[in-house]
UniProtKB/Swiss-Prot annotation:
Transmembrane segments: none annotated. Its EC number is 2.3.3.16. It catalyses: oxaloacetate + acetyl-CoA + H2O = citrate + CoA + H(+). This is Citrate synthase 1. Keywords: Allosteric enzyme, Transferase, Tricarboxylic acid cycle. It holds the Pfam family Citrate_synt. Pathway: Carbohydrate metabolism; tricarboxylic acid cycle; isocitrate from oxaloacetate: step 1/2. Citrate synthase is found in nearly all cells capable of oxidative metabolism. Belongs to the citrate synthase family. It comes from the Bacteria. Homodimer.
Length: 366
């Protein structure tokens, strides 16, 4: 029997996260991810995912200091970023540059110090590249800012408002980890050969680049832009459904009810955007889409997923579409590293089989 896409196949045991698709729950190390996102900092969430518990005050400060100390880009990385073509997409740049971090010190077994460096430096790579292609002066990281604030600052040169900071932080926390998805699987497969951490997350970045995995928020933005006005929503959505096309930002392969991440992001989008026209349109499109999905796909119970409100949050904090997947990747670096570290603890190389469908040569009698 062939399990296409490995759907329904359990290949590892993990204590990092749990997705309960029937009840709409995402759990990080024994805690509801929604609660962590709404009530804790990115650094606390990252510590939880990496080390299995929330940090004490002292542990948190040490962790913050370590992250801040690893934000600066080495000179060879700056030169590499500058040398890449301006029309090279951001995810290809990120994949290429991260792979260049793989010095001889990165070997099997991976170390938490290596993970901390990758988590800290990835936003710096994204921000440096974005400003370089815009012809803007690079902004050095600031130790006075936390992980999320510093990312925003290095991109824009400004300190975010508290509402914008918390909206971005909520999104990044909810993007840190989501079970055995395609990119996490890629990372664990690579590490299972006793390769190094940089190679593993480089493989994950290559997987994240695919539009079926990392590109959905951009597609949601395009849909909202195509609709434009609330009065156009019904006709647009009906046309899509009648053609059998997918509504971007609705439904999830795992969740059979409301995506808990979407609920948290909706709350933050409303806080930062207030009466913003774009958010008002998004709320209207959500209501219309759910109503029409019940008519066109009765019994399917398709709800808004995280990508829908990720797009709303990113628009509300003035991040352009090109930053969606890189920001997602900077967040997911935490989960990738945690899974790679976990894989190394009880490693076995992945070696599934394939069912051959080609011809068999006839036996020649001697």
């Amino acid at each position: 029997m062939v399990h296409y896409g490995l759907k329904g196949i359990t290949c590892v045991e993990t204590s990092i996260s749990h997705i309960d698709g029937e009840k709409g729950r995402l759990i990080y190390r024994g805690h509801h991810a929604k609660d962590i996102a709404l009530n804790h900092s990115f650094e606390e969430a990252a510590y939880l995912i990496l080390f299995g518990k929330l940090p004490s005050t002292e542990e948190l400060q040490v962790f913050k200091d370590k992250l801040a100390a690893e934000r600066n880009l080495p000179e060879h990385i700056e030169r590499l970023i500058q040398s890449l073509p301006n029309n090279m997409d951001d995810m290809s740049v990120l994949r290429t540059v991260v792979s260049a971090l793989g010095e001889n010190t990165y070997t099997f077994h991976p170390k938490t110090e290596e993970a901390i460096r990758l988590i800290a430096i990835t936003p710096s790579i994204i921000a440096y590249r974005k400003r370089w292609t815009r012809g803007e002066q690079a902004i050095a990281p600031s130790s006075q800012y936390g992980h999320v604030e510093n990312y925003y600052y290095m991109l824009t040169g400004e300190q975010p408002s508290e509402a914008k900071k918390k909206a971005l932080e909520t999104y990044m926390i909810l993007a840190t980890e989501h079970g055995m998805n395609a990119s996490t699987f890629s990372a664990r497969v690579t590490l299972s050969t006793e390769s190094d951490l940089v190679s593993a997350v480089t493989a994950a970045l290559g997987t994240m680049k695919g539009p079926l995995h990392g590109g959905a928020p951009s597609a949601v933005t395009k849909m909202l832009e195509d609709i434009g006005e609330k009065e156009h929503a019904e006709a647009y959505l009906k046309e899509k459904l009648e053609k059998g096309e997918r509504l971007m930002g609705f439904g999830h392969r795992v969740y059979k009810t409301k995506d808990p991440r979407a609920e948290a992001l909706r709350q933050k989008a409303e806080e930062v955007a207030g009466n913003d026209r774009d958010l008002d349109l998004a709320l209207h499109v959500e209501a219309e889409a759910i109503r029409l999905l019940e008519i066109y796909k009765p019994g399917r119970k398709l709800y808004t997923n995280v990508e829908f409100y990720a797009a709303a949050v990113m628009r509300a904090i003035d991040f352009d579409d090109e930053l969606f997947t890189p920001t997602f990747s900077a967040s997911r670096m935490v989960g990738w590293c945690a899974h790679v570290l976990e894989q190394a603890e009880n490693n076995m190389i992945f070696r599934p089989s394939a069912q051959y469908t080609g011809a068999i040569p006839e036996e020649v009698l001697s």
